[in-house]
Amino acid sequence: MALDWDFMFHSIPAFFKGLELTLYISFFGILLSLLVGFLCAIVLYFKTRFISPIVYIYGEIARNTPLLIQLFFLYYGLNEIGLSALECAILALGFLGGGYMSQSFLLGFKSLASIQRESALSLGFSPLKMMYYIVLPQSLSVSMPSIGANVIFLLKETSVVGAIALTDIMFVAKDFIGIYYKTTESLLMLSLTYLIALLPLSVLFVILERSFKKKVA
């Protein structure tokens, strides 16, 4: 079966419009997940009393429930709050990602030898200064591959936000399939659009990983 190249060409603006929304949700959702994950990792790393169990439970819930359910819970279950679909998508992505990012950061923190932490504390470093000057710079070289994988995973997870009527690239593809019955062309354009977004990210994280390793070496 021959591809309808004319249809694919004329669908480019719609897919790029959907990509714009996908990247917007991904940017703020991933930013939120990095912040939440980092703070949770610090709590787990220092084994903060009372708070650590709560953070642990949050992480288990975030990682073991699908993003779609989290979206529905925010958009339909808590509709009295009045959050928009876009806000729900960003918050749900941040909630899901925070659970994964916390483990990525924690992996890096735990990679440091205990003697480094003990030496820093004996030299009068506060836990905050120790984290900033010693733990964070060295741990990022270990955490970066996992963080990069999580970022790519979260961007791909945005494919479900169309369930709450957000016109991301997956929504655009489904719309074209339903209206024009161009299944192969629509899915091919969808795949190409994701590749345009994800391949530069993959390269970026490889560069960042090498950069952090050189700084630590």
Where are these regions (language model features)?
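Transmembrane alpha-helices and adjacent helix-loop boundaries
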Residues: 1-217
